[in-house]
From Swiss-Prot:
CDD domains: NTP-PPase_HisIE_like. The keyword Nucleotide-binding applies. Pathway: Amino-acid biosynthesis; L-histidine biosynthesis; L-histidine from 5-phospho-alpha-D-ribose 1-diphosphate: step 2/9; Amino-acid biosynthesis; L-histidine biosynthesis; L-histidine from 5-phospho-alpha-D-ribose 1-diphosphate: step 3/9. Keywords: Amino-acid biosynthesis, ATP-binding, Cytoplasm, Histidine biosynthesis, Hydrolase, Multifunctional enzyme, Nucleotide-binding. One of its GO terms (biological process) is L-histidine biosynthetic process. GO terms for molecular function: ATP binding; phosphoribosyl-AMP cyclohydrolase activity; phosphoribosyl-ATP diphosphatase activity. PANTHER family: HISTIDINE BIOSYNTHESIS BIFUNCTIONAL PROTEIN, HISTIDINE BIOSYNTHESIS BIFUNCTIONAL PROTEIN HIS7. The lineage of its organism: Bacteria, Thermotogati, Thermotogota, Thermotogae, Thermotogales. Residues 109-197 are annotated as: Phosphoribosyl-ATP pyrophosphohydrolase. In the N-terminal section; belongs to the PRA-CH family. In the C-terminal section; belongs to the PRA-PH family. Pfam families: PRA-CH, PRA-PH. One of its GO terms (cellular component) is cytoplasm. This is Histidine biosynthesis bifunctional protein HisIE. Its main location: cytoplasm.
Length: 197
């Protein structure tokens, strides 16, 4: 009988969990050989390469086994403009079943970036973000600069509560600036990763 291993797929730079699929030994070997994510379809009873038909391929940079050697983690490079889920969502894990409390998720900046980018694409009425985009680069740069100065002021005044507030404002305006310039969170995370020593 063929052994199937659950495989969790995680984006390298953001840590975002993209999907869960299954792999047999052959799919694992194909992944190692080609550098692209391969799985075994339980429904079709055959090997498949992720993105073979959709173009949303996943370049695997690392494969990890769990402590019991019965599950795997594919760490992948997966550009921001690609989707992992057949529904058209970036991640297959988009349905919130239950939230115990706000957790300050490490992927929140990514979620914020996507929301800001969506505002830029759809331009809904009454949105402050849309107002910034309509006013252009000069206004976006000015607002980011103002918020950066307020962060410095909060820091120098040793006012932690105000500093957190101002950093949040600055991060929001930085995210607007990035979306307007076409710079993604992944771009920034990759650059930071290069600098890690």
């Amino acid at each position: 009988m063929m052994t199937l291993y659950p495989v969790v797929v995680q984006e390298r730079t953001t840590g975002e969990v993209l999907m869960l699929a299954y792999a047999n030994e052959e799919a694992l070997e194909l992944t190692k050989k080609t550098g692209y994510a391969h799985f075994f379809s339980r429904e079709r009873q055959k090997i498949w390469k992720k993105g073979e038909t959709s173009g949303n391929t996943m370049r695997v940079v690392e494969i990890r086994r769990d402590c019991d050697d019965d599950a795997y983690l594919y760490i992948v490079d997966f550009p921001e403009d690609k989707v992992a889920c057949h529904t058209g969502n970036r991640s297959c894990f988009f349905k919130v079943e239950h939230r115990f409390e706000e957790t300050g998720s490490p992927t929140f900046w990514l979620e914020l970036y996507r929301l800001v980018r969506k505002r830029k694409e759809e331009m809904p009425e009454g949105s402050y973000t849309v107002k910034l985009f309509k006013e252009g680069k000069g206004k976006i740069a000015k607002k980011f600069g103002e918020e950066a100065v307020e962060v410095i002021t909060g820091y120098l005044q040793n006012d932690r509560e105000n500093l957190v507030w101002e950093i949040a404002d600055m991060m929001y305006h930085l995210t607007v600036l990035m979306a307007d310039a076409g710079v993604t969170v992944q771009d920034v995370m990759r650059e930071l990763e290069k600098r890690r020593k």
